[in-house]
Structures are given as structure tokens and as C-alpha cells.
């Protein structure tokens, strides 16, 4: 089994490509890219809320992810099966909150949840379609985080476009805070706790 771990931060996005054969995790590749929700929000501030601006962000991020894909051929491994996608960041926890239909963020419900790729993509589209005012009002976002949600969603969309794993494991903690242990314990996907929110 293999796992692609990603952490979308404020100023960077970290990727770790890990082999889990035999229960002992082996790091096969690691990359820290100088792009995060804050830096992307600054670069695309005037266009991030438009469809054109969002797709421009995604295209820009995909170009930066491609060297990692060319080296490790992760998409090929995903097609063969046995690859887990595990993410941590305000972006993926927000997507999980949307899928669960939470009226406020609750870490115990979000941490460790396994989302189907379809649910995660649908939650992303919902957030993208809300617009600035809708993101300000959404209980899982709020005014303090609204400007950073779509840049984070753009990173997630770029990751999903290159590496469309069947499920996404969500962790409310960093790459260095036990994610490998969580990944090793995730032997098979469990259904997400709840359906898509239609708020």
C-alpha cells in the first residue's frame, strides 16, 4: 500500500509519498512547495472568486505539482489501486464539515473521517459557488477565513485532478503530528458520517 499525504498551509504545501508495505512506513518522496492559502490569496485576490480566477489558480498549482508526479508516477499507482490520499489543513477539514452539514466546526467528528472523492469534490463545488458573501456566512468558514478558503480549494482541486484517489482521509493535525500512524491504521475506507449538506 502507498499513501500520498498533503498539508495545505498558509505559505506552503507539503507532499509526502509513503510506502506502507509490511506496516513500516517508508518515505519515498517529499516536497515543500512555496504556495499556500495566504500566498495564493495575495496573488489572485482580485479574481479568486470568479470561475476564471479559480481555474487559473488550479492550473498554476498543477504546473507546480507536475514535477512530483513525473518523478513518482503516483497517478499510475492510483490506477493500479492501493493508494490512500490523506490531507490535513483548514481546507480539507472545512470540506469535511460541509459534507457532514455541521452548523459549527467539531473536531471529533471531522478528525479521521474518510470522504469519498465524489463527496469531497461536491463540497468543493458548493464552496466555490457560494461567492464571497456566502463564504462569510457559512458556519464552517466565517469572515475571518473566507478569503483563504478558495485558494485552499484550488490546491485541493489541483491535487485531485492529478491524483484522483477513490477516498480522502481527513486529519485535523499536521504531517508531523501522527498522520503516518493514522494512515497505517486506516486499513480500509469507512463511510463518511453523513451525506452532503445542501445549505
Region annotations inferred by a language model:
Residues 7:
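Conserved catalytic-loop position in the HRD/HxD motif
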Residues 11-14:
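Acidic, divalent-metal-coordinating active-site segment for phosphoryl/phosphodiester hydrolysis
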Residues 1-3, 17-20, 24-199:
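Helical "lid/coupling" subdomains associated with nucleotide-phosphate turnover
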Amino acid at each position: 500500500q502507498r499513501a500520498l499525504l498533503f498539508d495545505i498551509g498558509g505559505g506552503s504545501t507539503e507532499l509526502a509519498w509513503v510506502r506502507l508495505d509490511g506496516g513500516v512506513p517508508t518515505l519515498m518522496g517529499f516536497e515543500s512547495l512555496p504556495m499556500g492559502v495566504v500566498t495564493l490569496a495575495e496573488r489572485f485576490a482580485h479574481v479568486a472568486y470568479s470561475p476564471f480566477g479559480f481555474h487559473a489558480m488550479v492550473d498554476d498549482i498543477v504546473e507546480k505539482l507536475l514535477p512530483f508526479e513525473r518523478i513518482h508516477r503516483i497517478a499510475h499507482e492510483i490506477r493500479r489501486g492501493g493508494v490512500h490520499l490523506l490531507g490535513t489543513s483548514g481546507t480539507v477539514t472545512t470540506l469535511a464539515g460541509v459534507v457532514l452539514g455541521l452548523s459549527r466546526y467539531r473536531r471529533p467528528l471531522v478528525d479521521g473521517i474518510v470522504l469519498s472523492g465524489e463527496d469531497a469534490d461536491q463540497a468543493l463545488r458548493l464552496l466555490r459557488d457560494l461567492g464571497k458573501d456566502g463564504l462569510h456566512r457559512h458556519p464552517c468558514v466565517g469572515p475571518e477565513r473566507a478569503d483563504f478558503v478558495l485558494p485552499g480549494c484550488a490546491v485541493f482541486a489541483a491535487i485531485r485532478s492529478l491524483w484522483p484517489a477513490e477516498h480522502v482521509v481527513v486529519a485535523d493535525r499536521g504531517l508531523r503530528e501522527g498522520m503516518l500512524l493514522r494512515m497505517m491504521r486506516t486499513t480500509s475506507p469507512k463511510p463518511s458520517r453523513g451525506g452532503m449538506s445542501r445549505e
